[in-house]
Amino acid sequence: MRNNYSKIRGYFKLIRKRDGRVVPFDIGKIEQAIFKASQAVGEANRPLAQDLAKKVLSRLEKKTSKQEIPTVEGIQDIVEQILIETGHAKIAKAYILYRQHRAEIRAEKQQILNKKEIDEIDKHFDINALRVLAARYLRKDDQGKIIESPKELFERVAVHVALPSLFYDSKIYQKRGGAPLHLIEKFDHRKFENKFSIGKFKLNQFHLEALKSLYSRFVNNRQIKVSWSAFLNLFKKGYFDKYEAEIVEYYKLMISRQFLPNTPALVNFGNVLGMGSACFTLDIKDSIESIMDTLKAAAIIFKAGGGVGYNFSKVRPEGDYVKSTGGSASGPISFMSMFDVMTDVIKHGGVRRGANMGILDSDHPDIEKFIKAKEGNKTLRNFNISVMLMPEFWDCCKQNKPYSLINPRTGKPIQEIDPRKLLDMLVYQAWESAEPGVLFFDRINEFNPFYKSLGPIYSTNPCSEVLLYPNE
């Protein structure tokens, strides 16, 4: 147990940290540092640590005036002196080596973060974690230099997360709609950088841009009671300061590493793109226009750190007739290769590699080529692939009867195959290259609450744990 130092605290109430912050003075920390050093050399002695801490305090009082605030470095120098003067050379050596080790860690963190001094948040994260933050998440200027600290990162994310709560405030929100259709006033978010606050947290231009976007959405739903000008005026009056606690709560969750959001949120919240979702699905229709539009949309999503799932089953099979040119189609797998190359290009410039889920229905004429598409892991390296097993496939498997493959362009059968051989091929390829996976159309849609209104689900996110309709 630590001794009660309240009677010997002297006139020191504050201490200056290396980053310039002034915090309450705690002699117990001096005692603990000495005790750990003694423990490191096999001479753990709590009473000795307490006695030496008192000597350090006494020396500090003699060397420092009442008007001065002692520094961490100054106190640590005195600890070394006291340890040596009192004959505890082994403990002094351990303490000195520990100081040196900590100094080396601080220097490396300063270099990684491009800072002169690390702060209390930098101390929460080890060197490897800070390297990841610096490489992926901290904002940089056009020269690639870091212009944001981890503390600033977590603050901008926490503020962004809290913004929607403002719109559900009783003074703002009209749940059942029917509110006046307010004019969407012009607002240049760049001119109001850091001009509005929620408590101590200032809103940057990208927070304000997100705020205006949310406001417009609620106005279109007729759920906002006040005009945009009145809404901003509430900031000036400090009305929204009550949401500061929500920001602090989320901020503390992140810096304590109890919870960290996904990459898009860390990169984009309070930043240019603003996108926080990681999982998307896009539709692909049987036309070159649709395919290229989807390719462009996927590239934009990858740029912001998201991933995309697609079902390529609407694309006509390889060799099928193309009316506009009189030629033949290249098939879904060749177009998947185009998406794969695009993903490879984007991943070199983005915050992380892109991720794709390519799905093909089991009754597509190119299903056998699809199953073998990742054989030897030589192609489609930026894709997970899965076969959507249709209910008829299992019926044919059980009854050992031919399974029809359907041309998606005409809706007519063009070939029959042995379903059991197809299943064997699928199982072998999953063993050989861990691809493809399987999705069960009947099970997915058996519990789909939107089946009657929106139809079946036939696509998933890149990791396949989230079932989504196209363009979700």
Model-derived segments and their meaning:
Residues 1-472:
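Extended catalytic cores of very large enzyme megasubunits
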